[in-house]
């Protein structure tokens, strides 16, 4: 799947929103990737999952952070014949709940939807490693990172959108209302 195809799907399904957004990282942006608009379409998710699955060999488990990446992670697990787990926030940290456990040495792929700072992906990566499992990679649909990401990853498409620290956000300075569409609540500044 070529980057242009992914960008076309983002545009076609109304997944690129313009405005003033609070990202899950706590930063602000004038553009938000509303991946849920893509995930309404199983054929789109399956296409992404098939491509991501082709990048990795012998995956035994797929782990995604809840909530947004769950549909994609599940589809990648199906494509790799692996089991699927997800990590949830508890007291601010991503943890396994609901009896989810990884086995020592289990070849585990971390699947994210959008990577901005890589914080959630890094948390899941650390969780996988702490369990004794082998983290074989991190994959995402969209890479919108603007700086170094602590864990190596691959994405279907790389996009560049403006990202601002809350204290230096020109949209805040103009009084543009801030929207918080993401799945993780971060207090606004």
PLM regions: where:
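Active-site-facing substrate-recognition patch
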Residues: 1-58, 185-189
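PRPP-dependent phosphoribosyltransferase catalytic core
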Residues: 3-9, 125-189
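Short, well-ordered alpha-helices that flank and scaffold nucleotide-derived cofactor binding pockets
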Residues: 50, 54, 74, 78, ...
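Alpha-helix C-terminal capping segments
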Residues: 52-58, 76, 145-150
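Short glycine-rich phosphate-binding loop at a beta-alpha junction
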Residues: 59-66
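Conserved acidic residues
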Residues: 60, 106, 136
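Short, glycine/charge-rich flexible loops or terminal/linker lids adjacent to PRPP-binding catalytic cores
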Residues: 67, 72-109, 117-122
């Amino acid at each position: 799947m070529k980057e242009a195809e992914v960008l076309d799907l983002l545009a076609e399904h109304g997944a690129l929103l313009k405005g003033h957004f609070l990202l899950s990282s706590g930063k602000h942006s004038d553009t938000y990737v509303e991946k849920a608009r893509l995930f309404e379409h199983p054929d789109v998710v399956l296409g992404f999952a098939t491509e991501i699955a082709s990048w990795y060999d012998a995956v035994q488990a797929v782990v995604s952070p809840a909530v947004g990446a769950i549909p994609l992670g599940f589809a990648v697990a199906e494509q790799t014949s692996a089991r699927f787990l997800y990590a949830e926030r508890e007291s601010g940290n991503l943890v396994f709940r609901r009896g989810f456990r990884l086995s020592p040495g289990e070849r585990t792929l971390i699947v994210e939807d959008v990577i901005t700072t890589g914080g959630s992906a890094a948390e899941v990566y650390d969780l996988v490693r702490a369990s004794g499992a082998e983290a074989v990679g991190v994959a995402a649909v969209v890479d919108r990172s603007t700086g170094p990401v602590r864990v190596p990853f691959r994405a279907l498409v790389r996009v560049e959108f403006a990202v601002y620290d809350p204290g230096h956000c020109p949209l805040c300075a103009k009084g543009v209302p801030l929207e918080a569409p993401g799945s993780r609540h971060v207090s606004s500044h």
